[in-house]
From Swiss-Prot:
A Pfam family matched in the record: DAO
Binding site for FAD: S10, I13, R33, D34, A45, S46, G50, N52, R311, G361, S362, G364, Q366
Changes seen on gene knockout: Decreases growth on D-alanine, D-cysteine, D-histidine, D-leucine, D-methionine, D-phenylalanine, D-proline, D-serine, D-threonine, and D-valine nitrogen sources. Decreases growth in presence of D-alanine. Does not affect virulence in a mouse intrapharyngeal aspiration model of infection or an intravenous injection model of infection. Triple knockout of DAO1, DAO2 and DAO3 decreases growth on D-tryptophan, D-tyrosine and D-asparagine nitrogen sources and decreases virulence in a mouse intrapharyngeal aspiration model and an intravenous injection model of infection.
Swiss-Prot/TrEMBL induction comment: Expression increases when grown on D-alanine or D-proline as nitrogen source.
Natural source organism: Cryptococcus deuterogattii (strain R265) (Cryptococcus gattii VGII (strain R265))
Motif Microbody targeting signal positions after renumbering to this chain: 390-392
Cofactor: FAD
EC number in record: 1.4.3.3
The protein, known as: D-amino-acid oxidase 2
Length: 392
């Protein structure tokens, strides 16, 4: 069998793109170091996500469009797989006054039942905050959704090869796949070190969460201001307080993800227990119900696990574009090629292309279906152009 394209990476972006390409009738194969069944691997971020649809993209940007496309497709997933995707109440709360443009999100007319909130004697907001807004949106079970996508892709006959690429050139002629003219680079953090890409703008956005058990808790609460700032000896604020969020998971387990942390260029995969305590305190302040009907403090919250994930972020903006290039003997020099494996760097010199789709940071799940749609548009356009040229 010959393939139209190879997708590098089996996180939520790579899997979503592979499925979309298959939907369009293209023959696709996948190659990745970490696979969906590696749900305890810290080598990729997807299994560790809190996973809700709460866009923090700036309105009118490509990222906002990806989020909107994804949102429009989640209703079907929630209907077919309520154990993977569920529509629940959301709220975002804060204390400091904001202008209307700051306090109203671009997606207020997209989500369900949006309304502005203000604390009154008769209406107290989460954490005793003064302002907020509420709506209904979707939460997903990240590790199970990744496994679901992977199982669906395998059921369609799409091969997924476990292989660690050193250079992008290798992907154009892999054993068991053969020659292709197009590769989709959804390698996430791997784009920083993959020879032939080596994107210096890519960085790790370390996240840490606490998975807890709180049966019956079904509300997603976001608090971007945080409660506790780091102070110096005189009591002055050194850094602003980290945000806090509460994201229930679909399914019967009663699991809830508590966060949050976003630490740029921190590559540690070890949980920081001091940070975990801060997360538990913050989330208890927002929702004491997490501690159960008899709970009296954050210490009564039932902890399941401490988790760390490295978000594949990128300076400026995510990268979604096509790059035309060459592979084969003499095609590339420098940029690490002197130490690259010879496989993929030798042989017939030919023109190829790569569609880059990485650097989405914290927004992987909520942007995945939109990003897959736009990446697939680029793939189709390129392959159509090659077929047209071949006929001339």
């Amino acid at each position: 069998m010959s393939f139209d394209a190879v997708v590098i990476g089996s996180g939520v972006i790579g899997l979503s793109i592979a499925r979309e390409l298959d939907n369009r009738g293209l023959k696709v194969a996948m190659v990745a170091r970490d696979l969906a069944e590696d749900s305890l691997s810290v080598g990729f971020a997807s299994p560790w996500a809190g996973c809700n649809w709460y866009s923090f993209a700036e309105g009118g940007t490509p990222a906002a469009e990806w989020d909107a496309i994804t949102f429009s497709k989640l209703a079907k997933l929630a209907e077919d797989h309520p154990d993977l995707c569920e529509k629940i109440p959301f709220c975002s709360v804060w204390d400091l006054p904001k202008s209307d443009s700051e306090s109203e999100p671009w997606f207020k007319d997209l989500v369900f039942e949006y309304k502005k909130l203000k604390s009154t004697p008769g209406q107290h907001l989460a954490g005793g905050k003064k302002f907020g807004y509420s709506f209904k949106s979707y939460v997903l079970h990240a590790p199970n959704y990744i496994r679901h996508l992977s199982s669906e892709i395998r059921a369609r006959g799409i091969p997924i090869h476990r292989y660690r690429l050193s250079s992008i050139d290798e992907a154009y002629n892999l054993p068991g796949i053969g020659k292709v003219s197009l590769v989709v680079n959804a390698s996430g953090l791997g784009a920083k070190s993959l020879i032939g890409v080596e994107d210096e703008k890519v960085y790790s956005g370390r996240g840490q969460t606490v998975l807890v058990r709180a049966p019956g808790f079904k509300a997603c609460i976001m608090h971007t201001e945080g409660f506790y700032a780091d102070l110096d000896e005189s009591g002055r604020e050194i850094t602003p307080p980290p945000p806090a969020y509460i994201i229930p998971r679909p399914g019967p387990e009663g699991h809830v993800v508590l966060g949050g942390v976003y630490q740029k260029d921190n590559w540690s995969t070890l949980p920081d227990l001091k940070e975990a305590e801060r997360i538990l305190k913050d989330c208890y302040n927002l929702a004491p119900e997490l501690a159960g009907p008899n709970g009296k403090s954050w210490k009564d919250i039932e902890i399941i696990s401490h988790n760390v994930g490295l978000r594949p972020a990128r300076e400026g903006e995510p990268r979604l574009e096509i790059e035309e290039r060459e592979v084969g003997t003499g095609a590339n020099g420098g940029n690490g090629y002197e130490v690259a494996p010879k496989f993929g760097c030798e042989g017939e010199r030919r023109k190829v292309a790569v569609v880059h789709a990485y650097g989405i940071g914290s927004a992987g799940f909520q942007a995945s279906l939109g990003m897959a749609e736009k990446a697939s548009d680029l793939v189709e356009k390129y392959l159509s152009g090659r077929r047209t040229s071949a006929k001339l």
